[in-house]
UniProtKB/Swiss-Prot annotation:
Protein name (record): Packaging protein 1
Pfam families the UniProt entry points to: Adeno_IVa2 (PF02456)
UniProt biased composition (Polar residues): 1-23
Organism: Fowl adenovirus A serotype 1 (strain CELO / Phelps)
Region described as DNA-binding: spans on this chain: 419-439
UniProt keyword annotations, A-Z: Activator, ATP-binding, DNA-binding, Host nucleus, Nucleotide-binding, Phosphoprotein, Transcription, Transcription regulation, Viral genome packaging, Viral release from host cell, Virion
An annotated GO BP: nuclear capsid assembly
GO cellular component: host cell nucleolus; host cell nucleoplasm; virion component
Keyword Cell inner membrane carried by entry: no
Length: 439
């Protein structure tokens, strides 16, 4: 008696199909048929439509996003190259891929676009204040202003003080300037003449119709000289005293007080802290004609010999710090570590390198720090030799630094795709006929 062995029927597993193989009977690939598959002791069904080969989509991109991101990519890479030139000890030289390669590999992701939008929004907000990429004034309409100017002898402090008024670097310009010195007759006649001339020059402006008219309510701003003892006398520090000189001049219009060569007096004399915080705000609020009140104190050393006195109070209440590029590098570094709390260490090193660059190439430039600016981009500024106020945009540079690091990381991740394949053939140039010589 013979037993007939039935033929083996092959089952079809959709998960192991390559998409091109035609399954055999009884699972013949009918779209309306369901195929059983054993899974953990149970049968489940899969439709043949789930394993149908997908059509490859054509590569699509947004042209506007492509062009806008190109400009931002070039700005970031150019900024990094400049940072390498300024601080090669911190920033290593990098060979960035071309933008087309970066874009084609998916580098323009959400993080990249978010950084681009943040920079764009910040620059749009800053454009409301800028004129040709520069700030029109150092105070940007804020009042009252207490500023400290640091610089050794011969660094151009006197020229800067006169330029603050004559070059329209204050808004509004003062009608009365009180110049305070340690002793009497310390201002040379030539400097007095320069002050009077530049005060008159700054007071007049040419209008569109060709007429020349004063900017203030007076034709000739007043220049007054006082000693330190006179300026800090009790009757002048008391705002309710009838002989207070500051109350009298504030009734005429904007006032500027300049304290020069008084560092020893400030360190060793009695407390005059009321001159640096209470007096300016009260005078500015009391008189309607006093639309501006400025106090500028000149210090020859950023680190006085004693930590007591009026200098620490002055630094705390100062709304503006202007540093000469003639000061030593270690003093600027100490200033950075004391005030630059909101920026990264890499940007601190970059600021130190930029200050060193100014010391070597633009000796009579200045670096200005404002604790409470109208925009975060204007916290750090530079004043060049033409007295142009240029914002350093440290907050935007922070975003450039983060984006540059992400580009570098992206390039390292896709190193194999970015590597150039070696040439399979090498073409050798043949010499023209008749150039071979027999030996």
């Amino acid at each position: 008696m013979s037993t007939q062995i039935p033929a083996r029927q092959e089952t079809y597993d959709p998960s192991q199909s390559s998409g091109t193989k035609t399954p055999s009977h009884p699972y013949d690939g009918n779209p309306t048929r369901s195929y059983p598959k054993r899974n953990a002791g149970k049968f489940t069904t899969y439709s043949s439509q789930m394993i149908a080969p997908r059509k490859r989509k054509a590569w699509e991109y947004e042209e506007e996003e492509y062009e806008a991101s190109r400009d931002f990519y070039q700005r970031v890479t150019s900024w990094y190259d400049g940072a390498v030139d300024l601080a090669p000890q911190l920033f290593r030289e990098q060979h960035f891929p071309s933008y087309d390669e970066f874009y084609s590999l998916g580098g323009v992701n959400e993080k990249f676009l978010e950084a681009h939008e943040e920079v764009k929004a910040q620059e749009q907000m800053d454009s409301r204040y800028l004129q040709h990429g520069q700030l029109p004034s150092i105070n940007m309409g804020k009042q009252p202003i207490i500023g400290v100017i640091y610089g050794p002898t011969g660094s151009g402090k006197s020229h800067l003080l006169r330029a603050l008024i004559s070059c329209n670097m204050l808004d509004p310009i003062p009608e009365t300037v009180i110049f305070i010195t340690p002793e009497k007759n310390m201002i040379p006649p030539i400097e007095q003449t320069s002050w009077n001339l530049q005060l008159v020059e700054a007071n007049f402006d040419c209008r569109e119709d060709g007429t020349i008219a004063p900017k203030t309510s007076t034709f000739r701003p007043e220049f007054m000289e006082m000693t330190y003892e006179e300026a800090t006398a009790p009757e002048h520090l008391n705002i309710d005293h009838p002989d207070n000189i500051y109350v009298k001049v504030s009734k005429r219009g904007p006032v500027a007080i300049i304290m020069d060569e008084c560092m020893d007096k400030l360190c060793s004399g009695s407390s005059v802290s009321v001159l640096f915080h209470a007096l300016p705000s009260k005078l500015f609020a009391r008189s309607a004609h006093c639309t501006a009140f400025y106090i500028f104190v000149v210090l020859h050393n950023m680190a006085p010999r004693t930590a007591i006195g009026n200098v620490p109070t002055l630094k705390v209440n100062a709304k503006m710090h202007i540093l000469s590029c003639h000061i030593p590098q270690f003093q600027f570094a100490r200033f950075l570590y004391a005030f630059a709390h909101n920026i990264s260490k890499d940007l601190v090193v970059l600021l130190k390198a930029y200050f060193s660059f100014l010391q070597q190439n633009q000796r009579f430039s200045w670096v200005m720090y404002t604790p409470d600016p109208v925009s975060e981009s204007f916290r750090w500024c530079s004043i060049d030799q033409q007295y142009s106020i240029i914002p350093l945009n440290v907050n935007i540079q922070e975003r450039f630094l983060k984006t540059a690091k992400s580009i570098i990381k992206f390039s390292e991740t896709h190193r194999k795709q970015l590597e150039r394949n070696p040439k399979l053939t090498d073409l050798e140039k043949l010499s023209p006929p008749g150039t071979f010589q027999e030996t």
